[in-house]
């Protein structure tokens, strides 16, 4: 057999050309210090801020501090499984969470894992946890109303789709109740809801889930829970997980309502994490970037332009104050980021006025553009009369000899306050609210005893619903024109004659 060198060299050449070896390069380092859910890692010189890290036993971490000779990382999961000397690998990926229709009706943790015992989740898309908010050109002014079903809010502090409206007040003043009412009122509107519980008791979260289920609201709601027993990094991640899930629906042109309950505990979790990472503390021991922590979260709520689907995320962040001090660090930060605030007053709450919304100092900076005309027509007068009533109330405490006009104004004010009272989980549709306000500002309740006002309102609305087309006309025309005004006045007068 004759050996042909050129043939052999040809075969070798072909083999060399076709040879491909893929190199899987992974940066690795080792844990030099671990404790309190924080790990310091030596050797991860190419790690990026926010990059996911792989610890042994399937534990994940996130690189946050990139220092000269080590990386400070938070451990997402059980920190007891990490020990000094463990090998850590950089994944090259940033934190992301699964999103999709399958999440509706489920309770998940900050990592998007189900914690409700209803089986596994099959999500449709991975969404980055920290995504840049949409720019100015991609947005559109707020112009569609988001009805909460609460008369004080829809009338005097209206919210539009794409708005950020802060709910602020002391503990036990009904902040969560207002947010839950808003979620329950989205039934049959097509709005998807996300409730993010940060640092709350597990029993409280269980009650909220049960309440949403009883009201038939859980089917269009995602609950993201990072309870008080979870580590600070998981509490820090929870709101970003919630908004990432919401962005999936917004990108599809759908509307989302997200509640962050509450951002005070979120800031405390971030402070704990930052101090453990040895970042320098600032005012109230919060780190210097605590404003950016909330601004980058709340800026992701938006009303998108028609060119990119016209979807929206409406955010209702909640802040807890100490003894009504709204000038503390975190409250002032969040007030300056949001488009208005709903202030819940502990004095009103304790006097039996629920929901305890103080309409005088609550404000909505952009929601007015989203109100229907019929509501604008009646609510402006309600707000004015309420302001005058509160002013007169102060004077009335000093003297009893008041003239008839002042007494009449005080009596009207008492009835407006009575009309604004509302039971929890009993939302009013917008046309019913318009009728209630119309009735009180036109003096039809002035001679009705205060303890009979709410019965009058209830029976009047039932009468209009059963025997007239007035409510349907308000929905259709969205304004009270002369003919509808006359019809409504006649209906109220006829009802008043037979009311006893």
Curated annotation (Swiss-Prot):
Cellular component terms (Gene Ontology): plasma membrane; proton-transporting ATP synthase complex
Site keyed Required for activity: positions: 362
Residues holding ATP: 169-176
GO molecular function, one term: proton-transporting ATP synthase activity, rotational mechanism
Primary location class: membrane
Catalytic activity: 4 Na(+)(in) + ATP + H2O = 4 Na(+)(out) + ADP + phosphate + H(+)
InterPro entries for this protein: ATP_synth_asu-like_sf, ATP_synth_asu_C, ATP_synth_asu_C_sf, ATP_synth_F1_a_nt-bd_dom, ATP_synth_F1_asu, ATPase_a/bsu_AS, ATPase_F1/V1/A1_a/bsu_N, ATPase_F1/V1/A1_a/bsu_N_sf
Protein name: ATP synthase subunit alpha, sodium ion specific
Lineage of the species this protein comes from: Bacteria, Fusobacteriati, Fusobacteriota, Fusobacteriia, Fusobacteriales
Gene symbol of the encoding locus: atpA
């Amino acid at each position: 057999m004759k050996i042909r060198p050129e043939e052999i060299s040809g075969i070798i050449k072909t083999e060399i050309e076709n040879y491909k070896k893929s190199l899987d390069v992974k940066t690795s380092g080792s844990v030099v210090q671990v404790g309190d859910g924080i790990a310091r890692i030596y050797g991860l010189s190419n790690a990026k801020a926010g990059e996911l890290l792989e610890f042994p036993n399937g534990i994940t971490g996130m690189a946050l501090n990139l220092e000269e000779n080590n990386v400070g990382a938070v451990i997402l999961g059980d920190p007891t499984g990490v020990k000094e000397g463990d090998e850590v690998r950089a994944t090259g990926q940033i934190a992301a969470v699964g999103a999709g229709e399958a999440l509706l009706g489920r309770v998940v943790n900050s990592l998007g894992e189900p914690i409700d015992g209803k089986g596994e989740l099959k999500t449709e898309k991975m969404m980055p946890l920290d995504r840049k908010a949409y720019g100015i050109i991609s947005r559109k002014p707020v112009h569609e109303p988001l009805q909460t079903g609460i008369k004080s809010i829809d009338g005097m502090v209206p919210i539009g789709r794409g708005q950020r409206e802060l709910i602020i007040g002391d503990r036990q003043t009904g902040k969560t109740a207002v947010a839950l009412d808003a979620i329950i009122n989205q039934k049959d509107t097509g709005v998807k809801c996300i409730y993010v519980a940060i640092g709350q008791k597990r029993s409280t979260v269980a009650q909220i889930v049960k309440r949403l289920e009883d009201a038939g609201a859980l089917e269009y709601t995602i609950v993201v829970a990072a309870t008080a027993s979870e580590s600070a990094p998981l509490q820090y991640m929870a709101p970003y997980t919630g908004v990432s899930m919401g962005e999936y629906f917004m990108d599809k042109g759908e509307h989302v309502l997200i509640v962050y309950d509450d951002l005070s505990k979120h800031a405390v979790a971030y402070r704990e994490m930052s101090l453990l990472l040895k970042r320098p503390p600032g005012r109230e021991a919060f780190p210097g970037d605590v404003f950016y922590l909330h601004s980058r979260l709340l800026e992701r709520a938006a009303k998108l332009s028609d060119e990119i689907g016209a979807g929206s995320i409406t955010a209702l962040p909640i802040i807890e104050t100490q003894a009504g001090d709204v000038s503390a660090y975190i409250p002032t930060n969040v007030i300056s980021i949001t488009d208005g605030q709903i202030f819940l007053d502990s004095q009103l709450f304790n006097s039996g006025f629920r929901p305890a919304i103080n309409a005088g100092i609550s404000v909505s900076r952009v929601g007015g553009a989203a109100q229907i005309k019929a509501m604008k027509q009646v609510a402006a007068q309600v707000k004015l009369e309420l302001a005058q009533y509160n002013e007169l109330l102060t004077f009335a405490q000093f003297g009893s000899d008041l003239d008839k006009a002042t007494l009449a104004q005080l009596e009207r004010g008492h009835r407006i306050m009575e009309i604004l009272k509302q039971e929890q989980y009993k939302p009013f549709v917008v046309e019913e609210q318009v009728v209630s306000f119309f009735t009180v500002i036109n003096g039809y309740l002035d001679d009705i005893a205060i303890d009979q006002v709410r019965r009058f309102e209830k029976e009047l609305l039932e009468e209009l619903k059963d025997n007239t087309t007035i409510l349907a006309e308000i929905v259709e025309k969205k304004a009270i024109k002369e003919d509808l005004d006359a019809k409504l006045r006649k209906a109220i007068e006829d009802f008043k004659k037979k009311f006893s």
